[in-house]
Amino acid sequence: MFATRSFCLSSSLFRPAAQLLRPAGRSTLRNVWRRSIATEHLTQTEANSRLASQRVHRPNSPHLTIYEPQLTWYLSSLHRITGCVVAGTLYAFAMGYLVAPLAGYSLDTATISGLIQQVPTWIKVPAKFVISYPLTFHIFNGIRHLIWDTTKELSLKGVYRTGYAVLALSVLTSGYFAMI
Amino acid sequence: MLQTRLGLGALRQGRLLFAVKSFSTTSVAKIFPPPPQTIKGTVNDAAVFPHHSKLHGSYHWDFERIIAIAMVPQVMIPLFTGTSHPLMDAALACTLITHAHLGFESCVIDYFPARRFKKLSPLMHWILRGCTVLTLIGVYEFNTNDIGLTEGIKKLWKS
């Protein structure tokens, strides 16, 4: 009984499977493993020149256009811009004070003060605000950075708290200076 | 260095398995034209570490912070109380122009990097130094021949 059943199972299972797999397996292996690949030897100069030509076509990484507008990096950029504005004004005036007599002009305080007195008040008040705002913002944001150098307020909540404090203080101080 | 190159036979047989894709799928946005691509040495050269100096590191950082901290009373006292003195004006001029020079130097380093602008970067540094010297001379002339920095700003502001 047992011998008869095992003989039948082996004959029915293995002979058709072998017949089915043999030609298909051979053709698949023949197609997969046959490749025609050629290699060429390059000198160091040729390899470097090819790499350089490939690097010319690399795209830039996305940067300023994909970042979300946030108080953190806006104030940081504004700190540098306001610093350049205030320092540029000082540099321009000092170099102008040196160069103006060569052209026959004079940049002394009395002359400029006389010119400013001719401007009406309703122009001078907003102009004073615009002129003083870079200075006051740079002062308070600089103090903010000095506070960070002492490792205080360096959490995200602290950064935003000091950021809003700087904005409020600079607006109020510039408003006060505009009214003088 | 060996560079592999696929022949036509491989492309014909493996067309479905090895489809060629482009390097980037969006338009290439370039800010500046790429600089001349020069590769120094080979991949087998030893790594060269930058020169280690405290004058460019912690001492420079300390100097910047000392100037900034020294400027806080020198700017706040004339700005909010209006008092002025020739020596205070002289000290304010020195620290203010030093602070401005350090700030402009950071801008030159960031926007004219020496690796990319090999000739323009030293030129910009020397232009900045020349302007700083002229500014120092100009403010000295203003403080000595005119009424001084603090009194001058006050007079212009209240005119």
UniProtKB/Swiss-Prot annotation, chain A:
Mitochondrial intermembrane topology ranges: 104-122
Q: What does this protein do?
A: Membrane-anchoring subunit of succinate dehydrogenase (SDH) that is involved in complex II of the mitochondrial electron transport chain and is responsible for transferring electrons from succinate to ubiquinone (coenzyme Q).
Kindly list the biological process annotations in GO that this record carries: mitochondrial electron transport, succinate to ubiquinone; reductive tricarboxylic acid cycle; tricarboxylic acid cycle
Residue numbers on the Mitochondrial matrix membrane side: 1-82, 144-159
GO cellular component labels: mitochondrial inner membrane; mitochondrion; respiratory chain complex II (succinate dehydrogenase)
Q: Which gene encodes it?
A: sdh3
Q: Which cofactor does it need?
A: heme
Membrane-spanning parts = 83-103, 123-143, 160-180
Q: Cite the GO molecular-function annotations of the record.
A: electron transfer activity; metal ion binding; protein-membrane adaptor activity
Topological type in the membrane: Multi-pass membrane protein
Q: By what name is this protein known?
A: Succinate dehydrogenase cytochrome B subunit, mitochondrial
Looking up InterPro entries in the UniProt record yields: SQR/QFR_C/D, Succ_DH_cytb556, SuccDH_FuR_B_TM-su
Curated annotation (Swiss-Prot), chain B:
Keywords in alphabetical order? Electron transport, Heme, Iron, Membrane, Metal-binding, Mitochondrion, Mitochondrion inner membrane, Transit peptide, Transmembrane, Transmembrane helix, Transport, Tricarboxylic acid cycle
Which InterPro entries does its entry note? CybS, SQR/QFR_C/D
Gene Ontology terms describing biological process: mitochondrial electron transport, succinate to ubiquinone; protein insertion into mitochondrial inner membrane; tricarboxylic acid cycle
Top-rank taxon: Eukaryota
Q: Where along the chain is heme bound?
A: 99
Induction comment:
Expression is down-regulated under conditions of iron depletion.
Q: Where is the transit peptide?
A: 1-30
A GO cellular component annotation here is: mitochondrion
* Pathway(s) the chain acts in: Carbohydrate metabolism; tricarboxylic acid cycle
Q: Which segments sit on the Mitochondrial matrix face?
A: 31-65, 110-122
Q: Which residues lie on this side of the membrane: Mitochondrial intermembrane?
A: 83-89, 141-159
Entry GO MF terms: heme binding; metal ion binding; protein-membrane adaptor activity; ubiquinone binding
Positions that bind a ubiquinone: 111
Q: What is the protein's membrane topology class?
A: Multi-pass membrane protein
One Pfam family per UniProt: CybS
**Where's it found, cell-wise?**
Mitochondrion inner membrane
What is the predominant subcellular site recorded for this chain?
Answer: mitochondrion
Name the SUPFAM superfamilies for this protein. Answer: Fumarate reductase respiratory complex transmembrane subunits
* Gene3D superfamilies to which the protein is assigned, alphabetical: Fumarate reductase/succinate dehydrogenase, transmembrane subunit (1.20.1300.10)
Q: Which residues cross the membrane?
A: 66-82, 90-109, 123-140
Q: How does it assemble?
A: Forms part of complex II containing four subunits: a flavoprotein (FP), an iron-sulfur protein (IP) and a cytochrome b composed of a large and a small subunit.
Homology family: Belongs to the CybS family.
* Name of the protein this chain belongs to: Succinate dehydrogenase [ubiquinone] cytochrome b small subunit, mitochondrial
Please tell me the species this chain comes from: Schizosaccharomyces pombe (strain 972 / ATCC 24843)
Q: What is the lineage of its organism?
A: Eukaryota, Fungi, Dikarya, Ascomycota, Taphrinomycotina
Q: Which gene encodes it?
A: sdh4
